[in-house]
From Swiss-Prot:
Family, as annotated: Belongs to the gamma-glutamyl phosphate reductase family.
Protein name as it appears in the record: Gamma-glutamyl phosphate reductase
NADP as UniProt keyword: yes
Encoding gene per record: proA
Its EC number(s): 1.2.1.41
PROSITE patterns: PROA (PS01223)
GO terms under biological process: L-proline biosynthetic process
Source organism, top-level taxon: Bacteria
Pathway recorded for this protein: Amino-acid biosynthesis; L-proline biosynthesis; L-glutamate 5-semialdehyde from L-glutamate: step 2/2
Amino acid sequence: MTTLSPYDNLSPVAQTAYRARAAAADIAPLPRAAKDDALLAIADALEVRTSEIVEANAEDVERAREAGTSEGIIDRLTLTPERIRAIAADVRDVAALPDPVGEVVRGSTLPNGIDLRQVRVPLGVVGIIYEARPNVTVDAAALCLKSGNAVLLRGSSSAYASNTALVRVLRDAVGGSGLPADAVQLVPGESRDSVRELMRARGLVDVLIPRGGASLIRTVVEESTVPVIETGTGNCHVYVDAQTDLAMAVDILINSKAQRPSVCNAAETLLVHKDVADAFLPLALDALADAGVTVHGDEHVLARAEGSKATVVPATTEDWETEYLSYDIAAAVVDSLDAAVAHIRLWSSGHTEAIVTTSQAAARRFTQLVDSTTVAVNASTRFTDGGQFGFGAEIGISTQKLHARGPMGLPELTSTKYIVTGDGHTR
C-alpha cells in the first residue's frame, strides 16, 4: 500500500514552502546554543568541501563566459578557496552575535497587576530572491538560522550549479547538527515561473527580501502578494556646501565613489553649491580622473571642466536616476542647499546622502530635510553598512519605512509578540 504525502498534489515550489513552514516551527523555540552549533557546522563544512563547491562554481563561470557576461558580474559569481574561507569566517561571526529571539523589547507591570512583555520572535519563513552572488546563499542562510527562521533561497539561474552545491553543503551541516535540514532550501526550478510562484505563496512564506538591481526589486515589489522588505537600489548623493573644507570634501567624494563603486552605498551623484564650484570642481575633477571616474556633468560642470584631465561628458536626465555601480558619477552645480535637497528628493532612491560642510546650521537643515535611510554629515556614504554601524552582519539595506529601515541585521529578521501574565485576572 502506498502512503500518500500531504504534499503529493502540490507543485514543487509549494512542497518546498510547506516543508520550510514545518521546519520554521521546529527551530523557532530552539536555544541559542543549538543554532550556533549548526552555524559552526556550516562553517566547517564549507571549508572541508571547498573543492566540491569550486567545481560546481566553475560550471557557472564557464557558462557565463560563453554567454558573453561582463567581467564584473563574472567576478561576483566566482568562488575561490580564499573566498570560501572568508564566507566561512563570516558564518562564524554570525554565530558569535547575540541571539535576538526572546529579547524583551519592553515590559512592565500594569496597574492591575498583569505582567506585560513584548518579546522578539522569528518572522517564520523568509524568501530571498537574489542575483548572481552565490555568497548571498550562505550569508542569508546563516542570518535566517541565527534568528530562528527557515529560509527559501532563489538565486539567479546563472549561479544555479553553485547554489545547488552550497545548499547541499548547508543542508548536510544543518541536519547533521540536529536541526531540520528543511530550514534551508533552494527553490526548485530555474525558470521565472518558480519565482512567480514564490512571490504568490502568501500564507506559506512570511516575507520576501529581494537583493539585486532595480529591475529585480521592482518586479518583486509590484508582483508579489507576499509582504516584501525592499532592499532598494543605491542612488546616493554627496552634496558639497557653500561653507566647506575643500580637502575634506575631495576625500569624502573619492571614498564615496571610487573605494568600491559596485556596491549600493557608493555615491552616484555629486551636487556642488554654486558659491564653491569654482574652487572645488577643479580639485574634484582631477581627483576623479586619478581614480578613473568618468563624470556626467551638467552645463555648469562642463563649463568648469576646461583644462581638467577628467573625462567629462554631458549629463542626460537618465543620469540623475542611474545607479551606475561603476566608475561613473553624475555631477551638477546647485544654487542652494534647498536646491540640493530638492534634487535629492526628486532622484534619490532613499538610501544614503552626505553633506560636506563646516556650517552646523547647514548640517542640521540637511539632516532634517533629507528623507533617506542614512544622512551623513562630513562622512562617506560608504559607512551605511551593518558591520560599520556595529550591528554585525546584514541581509541588505532596507530603503522602505515599514518594519525595517537601513541595515537589516538579526533584529530586523524578527517580529514581536506580547506575553500577558496574570493571576486569575479577568476583565
